[in-house]
């Protein structure tokens, strides 16, 4: 029996497991079992996190769904869920070491898919940083702090920062001071100029105070609990709530260093196989294949699931062609948005309509595989 072990309880891991389990029986009668390893008991719909930190906007059950229940249709002979954290990988021995309730558990594999994702450089509400309970508590804490704050600064003007500032300003733009700090000359740097211009205008319409070409040093906590930031121009900014949205780190600490690039991302070839590691593959944010964006992860998941089935059927896998087209869509408050496909700017009304709910209705269908 072939044992496929998948690491990660997010989009990469859960979607790949479902795609394989739903389709493998159509192509081969070879015996198999899938084990999904996740440090999170629940799937976190972090696409909606910028709105989720605002009190009363999104119920907890629309942000989190239990993973194991979503796989109940396959039966224990075909699927097993392991709640634990990957701590070590023995490529030669084809063994993964997982910390399960403080105990080191060794899991052997024939194929290993690493879809462990990434985390923010500074722990916050946008990605899980260890457990479902932990990120739930973080979101609840942020909701309380957002409610109480009179001045909020968002540092980092990439998509997460812009969406977060937009959501906050839509709700509180006339009652709280919302500041967005960008280290570059505009927001959404390296995106088409027409998109950055539109985003900037939409933010300003919502009363966001956008500071460009500005760096902020790590904040100092004052005796009253407020944060003091020293900006690159020398200005000292005192705020009630500091929200960092810059930088991600791959969750690859368990992978031997020879398989990682200088930034800690897993190096893969055109088949998503980890370079130099037979039978080990990596997709999504943890790999060096494409930008860490949802639609790229979906494409990669489809491809790796098909290749796994081909391998079990004794057929050659097919190479993946990475996308050379940049794309983005984001909501800026509930009534505006912008985005692009390549150099083509997407109409704001289209982005707003598509992203109106931040896709929370797709969470249950993603976890149980019914929308794949």
Swiss-Prot record:
MF terms (GO), sorted A to Z: electron-transferring-flavoprotein dehydrogenase activity; flavin adenine dinucleotide binding
Class of enzymatic activity (EC top level): oxidoreductase
Cellular component GO terms, alphabetical: cytoplasm
Details of cofactor binding? Binds 6-hydroxy-FAD non-covalently.
Glycosylated residue positions:
251
Return the Gene3D superfamilies for the record: 3.50.50.100
Q: Tell me its cofactors.
A: 6-hydroxy-FAD
What does the record give as EC number? 1.-.-.-
Record-given protein name: Oxidoreductase ptaL
The organism encoding this protein is Pestalotiopsis fici (strain W106-1 / CGMCC3.15140)
Lineage of source species: Eukaryota, Fungi, Dikarya, Ascomycota, Pezizomycotina
């Amino acid at each position: 029996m072939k044992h496929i072990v998948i690491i990660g309880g997010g989009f990469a891991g859960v979607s790949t497991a479902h795609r394989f389990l739903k389709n493998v029986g159509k192509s081969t009668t070879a015996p198999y079992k899938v084990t999904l390893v996740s440090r999170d008991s629940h799937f976190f719909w972090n696409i909606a996190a910028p709105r989720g930190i605002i009190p009363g906007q999104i119920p907890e059950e629309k942000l989190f769904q239990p993973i194991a229940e979503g796989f109940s249709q396959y039966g224990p002979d075909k699927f097993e869920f392991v709640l634990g954290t990957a701590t070590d990988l023995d490529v030669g021995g084809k063994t993964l070491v997982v910390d399960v309730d403080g105990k080191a558990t060794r899991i052997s594999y024939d194929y290993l898919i690493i879809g462990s994702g990434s985390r923010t450089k500074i722990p916050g509400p946008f990605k899980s940083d260890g457990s479902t309970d932990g990120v739930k508590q973080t979101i609840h804490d942020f909701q309380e702090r957002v409610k109480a704050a009179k001045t909020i600064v968002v540092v980092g003007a990439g998509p997460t920062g812009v969406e977060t500032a937009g959501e906050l300003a839509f709700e509180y733009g006339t009652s709280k001071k919302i500041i967005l700090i960008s280290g570059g000359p505009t927001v959404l740097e390296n995106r088409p100029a027409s998109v950055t211009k539109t985003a900037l205008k939409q933010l300003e319409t919502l009363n966001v105070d956008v500071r460009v070409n500005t760096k902020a040093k790590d904040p100092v906590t004052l005796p009253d609990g407020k944060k003091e930031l020293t900006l690159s121009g020398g200005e000292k900014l005192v705020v009630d709530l500091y929200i960092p949205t810059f930088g991600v780190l791959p969750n690859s600490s368990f992978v031997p260093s020879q398989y990682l690039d200088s930034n800690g991302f897993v190096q893969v070839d055109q088949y998503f196989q980890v370079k130099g590691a037979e039978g080990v593959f990596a997709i999504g944010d943890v790999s060096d294949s494409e930008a860490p964006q949802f639609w790229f992860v979906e494409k990669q998941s489809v491809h790796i699931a098909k290749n796994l089935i081909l391998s079990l059927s004794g057929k050659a896998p097919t190479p993946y062609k990475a996308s050379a087209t940049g794309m983005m869509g984001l909501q800026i408050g509930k009534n505006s948005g912008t985005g692009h496909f390549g150099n083509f700017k997407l109409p704001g009304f289209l982005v707003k309509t598509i992203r109106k709910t931040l896709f929370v209705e797709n969470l249950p269908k993603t976890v149980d595989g019914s929308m794949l």
